[in-house]
Amino acid sequence: MRNKKILKEDELLSETQQAAFHQIAMEPFEINVPKPKRRNGVNFSLAVVVIYLILLTAGAGLLVVQVLNLQARLRVLEMYFLNDTLAAEDSPSFSLLQSAHPGEHLAQGASRLQVLQAQLTWVRVSHEHLLQRVDNFTQNPGMFRIKGEQGAPGLQGHKGAMGMPGAPGPPGPPAEKGAKGAMGRDGATGPSGPQGPPGVKGEAGLQGPQGAPGKQGATGTPGPQGEKGSKGDGGLIGPKGETGTKGEKGDLGLPGSKGDRGMKGDAGVMGPPGAQGSKGDFGRPGPPGLAGFPGAKGDQGQPGLQGVPGPPGAVGHPGAKGEPGSAGSPGRAGLPGSPGSPGATGLKGSKGDTGLQGQQGRKGESGVPGPAGVKGEQGSPGLAGPKGAPGQAGQKGDQGVKGSSGEQGVKGEKGERGENSVSVRIVGSSNRGRAEVYYSGTWGTICDDEWQNSDAIVFCRMLGYSKGRALYKVGAGTGQIWLDNVQCRGTESTLWSCTKNSWGHHDCSHEEDAGVECSV
């Protein structure tokens, strides 16, 4: 009987060991100890398991922290995509994400988050399995050679962990382009801009032909002295004229009145001794003249064209007495004067006594030079010579220096809107196309009857251009035909000042709409 009990115990033990072996084979991480012999091995195994659990718990905690961080980042990313719009596109964090991963940061963040969630689930399941193994290891009676009771049937296993997420799918097709938005309303007319700078000084014109010399006018009363003018531009230098023929010596003029005492001149060449004249009286000094202001020195002009010498003029009428001139340079020695008329013969005196021979007298002092004669009267102007041939056009002068821009004027108040305002426009391009006018709240065209370049110039002037050219066959317009038979001279400021039919009166169709081509 005892042997049978021993055999039964051996069979039970072997069955228990086989069951434990099968259980160990099913659990891949369970320590395989088929025959523990000492208590020290069990303690060592428990210590190893505890250390492993601690490390696993620490690793799971780190994974949880990383998952929480990624979830926080995911919430931040979701904020940018609420209602399919980027509400916070200008934030620094969004721009930083875009600069770091411009096309991949969203897909990579979502895939990494899914991978971490799967790893966290796997760690949680592994942790549960490890706890079950520890329970099996500590509660297994076969490990301590104790017959255990038959265990209750195990609970139904938990649902398996979610599988690893699949690879992200290919990007979807690009979205269709949205419909074009409605055209916005016309903006309000802005205030007029400030006044522009003054224009550049124009080029100097061509020199005109030399005019005929005018007759000498009567001497006018001297006007008040004007202010000193600014320095003028240098004139063109005319050509040097031919030397005139020397005039004949004029008749001896009447003796002039005694003039003021002149300044002492340089000693002239001694003339032949003349008859000793009587000593004249000293004249009274004249009043000093007003000192004139020196004029600004002009630039040297270019030589003018050679003129045709005119015939000698006739003797002119005596002019008014001129003001005393400044002292001139010393003149050349004058010709010897004509001998004076002999005096009347005196009575013959009685012969006087022979006187003593006197001493030779000293040489007398040189007499005071006589006053300068009055300047001869100016001859009358000669007959006008034949008109010279027009000279060649001079070279184009250098462009003048651009004047300084004036100070910006004060901005004027905005004017009130006028009633029945009229304006013009070009349909086609900015400066070429069909001419249209705005009248009574409606745009209309112009008939090309009598439409010429002068009309186009006035039309372009209304748009700020300076030149214009009339065009025809520029394409038919629509709506009203406001003007017909427009006839401008080209100097008008607007078309409304030109001769034309009344507004809306015409005999044309839109095939005859007028056009313009404007230029600066």
UniProtKB/Swiss-Prot annotation:
Checking Gene3D superfamilies in the record gives:
SRCR-like domain
Q: How is it modified after translation?
A: N-glycosylated.
**Positions with biased composition (Low complexity):** 203-227, 290-345, 380-398
Query: Which residues get glycosylated?
Result: N83, N136
Q: Has keyword Cell membrane?
A: yes
**Extracellular side stretches:** 65-520
Q: Which residues form the SRCR domain?
A: 424-519
Q: Name one GO molecular function term.
A: cargo receptor activity
Q: Write out the transmembrane intervals.
A: 44-64
The molecule here is called Macrophage receptor MARCO
